[in-house]
């Protein structure tokens, strides 16, 4: 959850919501606890959390990314990279009809939505419907985080009934069918100086 930026941007209509957060870094997590004392923030790895399945209405986050895996027994058999693991576990934690809105990497960093290996997208497509995705220019987080990395915002809704093995999957599972917006190229570089 970082220092709780998503909590701070919560619309007034959701001000009575119960807030939960998970932050690996102890200093950052303690700052979030101070800023949002009514939120239940765990300072721990997501793989060590014990939230029950099907309890959250909405999950929002900026998932970690990288070419590594964490060990979490129920998910180890899927052999998912860290960012894809966050999707998989979160899908289980939201209720049927619940929404997931995650910022995740794309492009040469082995992103969730465009890497050649479709395993993670197949996992998501069996359990969720894709509501939409936005590809951000690689300069989106330059001023705030000092990084130039291409990112996607992915919106999923958990299905009432998962798609069965052998049932056709939606076209977004295949990378060659992924459509990007006109403001970024396939590597996430900006095509225009501004958007109006």
Where are the language model's segments positioned?
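Conserved Class I SAM-dependent methyltransferase catalytic core
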Residues: 22-26, 79-142, 149-155
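Conserved S-adenosyl-L-methionine
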Residues: 1-61, 66-68, 105-106, 154
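Short glycine-enriched, charge-decorated loop/helix-capping segments at active-site entrances
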Residues: 73-78
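Extended, compositionally biased low-complexity polar/Lys-Gly-rich tracts
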Residues: 2-4, 8, 92, 124, ...
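Conserved ATPase-coupling elements of RecA-like P-loop NTPase cores
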Residues: 68-72, 112-113
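Flexible, glycine-/basic-rich loop-and-beta segments that form/coincide
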Residues: 143-196
């Amino acid at each position: 959850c970082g220092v709780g930026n998503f909590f701070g941007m919560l619309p007034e209509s959701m001000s009575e919501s119960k807030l939960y957060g998970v932050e690996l870094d102890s200093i950052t997590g303690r700052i979030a606890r101070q800023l949002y004392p009514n939120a239940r923030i765990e300072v721990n790895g997501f793989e060590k959390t014990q939230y029950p399945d099907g309890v959250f209405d909405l999950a929002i986050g900026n998932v970690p990314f990288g070419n590594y895996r964490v060990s979490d027994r129920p998910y180890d058999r899927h052999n998912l990279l860290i960012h894809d693991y966050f999707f998989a576990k979160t899908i289980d934690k939201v209720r049927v009809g619940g929404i997931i809105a995650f910022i995740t990497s794309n492009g040469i960093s082995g992103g969730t939505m465009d890497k050649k290996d479709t395993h993670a997208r197949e996992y998501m497509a069996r359990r969720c419907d894709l509501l939409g995705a936005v590809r951000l220019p690689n300069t989106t987080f330059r001023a705030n985080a000092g990084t130039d990395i291409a990112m996607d915002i992915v919106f999923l809704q958990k299905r009432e009934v998962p798609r069965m093995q052998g049932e056709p999957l939606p076209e977004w599972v295949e990378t060659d069918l992924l459509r990007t917006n006109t403001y970024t190229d396939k590597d996430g570089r900006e095509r225009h100086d501004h958007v109006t």
